[in-house]
């Protein structure tokens, strides 16, 4: 199997995954220092440098106004409107909107891994600082704003660019319809999305980077994160109908190296990859509902010196439901299904796949209940199935498949406590903290429940308990 084919399979995680950092693995303490020193100086010199509390200070609203659970990726209707309108609401007052975030925790798996998941770590029972991120988040001009993230990975010990979403937005009346329209420049298909049902900002919002994860997932589910640059035009009509269309292009080895992603992570995207999104949303009383579709068509060259291509056509459908009561109860549910058609002419000709035509299907569902934005519990279900292919999915300890099947199925159970980051919290909006315990269980892993890898490992051996903290300033 070629390195490029491996990269696409490994980087395309549906669930679980870590959404904030997907850079290539490096080992550099110096890069951490180079990142932290100017960031700390900026934070200390600016009274407005806060969590993406920088958004909270700009708008004059608490983080909980935009986020369903005090703070984090999950957005309320207000949060979606703030993003839709280009991150410009409020008065930034001429200050620089900086923020920072730290995530870490303890990872325990049911059975030790054969090899350590990263340098400087053990095969089990690992304590880690997973991410230290710096942000620019807020208004640039009256009609443009940005969300820019740079992350140091505690596992890789390397700094890289992370999520990027730069927007320009305007509003207008066309006949009897009100329209918000705009442009987004971003570096990951679905990172610009307004909903938490799509891969870019979907559950789980935090996972261990040191635990085993299934080998297969559609390329739209993180396969191109921080490896491409794209632009899309969008419009929201009457706050109901959302339409978006755009395209992505791969970055050169030179730029990937400069940005910290690494030239060895290049998926070798051939030409432009079109992306589309459509969604219908509505509020009714204390409830909110949306249903939509999105997709991506892309061509890759596993061997950049060859004209032969692999094609990936992803088509997805998603839905979101939210309910909030005056008594402090909140409920949210997200559903997502992706079908990927794979035409692997280049990989098949090179002997890296057993078939020239494969497919993958993924289904995810998560339901969250929160009380007073303090106690939060979530259950998530995930299922991946697809074509058996001994070329793509070969036997190997822990990460391999004896049957050549990508099928994986399981659940995520999450319990969180949020002492800071709410409407009435101490030092709002500067101080934000959530702590939690997350358990990931596997019923199938890479094709089977028992001896899935050909070396005696069971799917349940990868069950993971992750105790974490998530701090934003």
Identify the function of each model-found stretch.
Residues 1-28:
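N-terminal secretory signal peptides that target proteins for export/translocation
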Residues 61-70:
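The canonical Cys-X-X-Cys-His
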Residues 62, 413-419, 459-473:
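Outer-membrane beta-barrel "beta-signal"
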Residues 74-76, 98-109, 121-253, 270-286, ...:
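Outer membrane beta-barrel
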Residues 105-111, 151-157, 173, 188-192, ...:
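Sequence/structural signature of outer-membrane beta-barrel proteins
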Residues 286-421, 426:
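Detector for outer-membrane/organellar transmembrane beta-barrel domains
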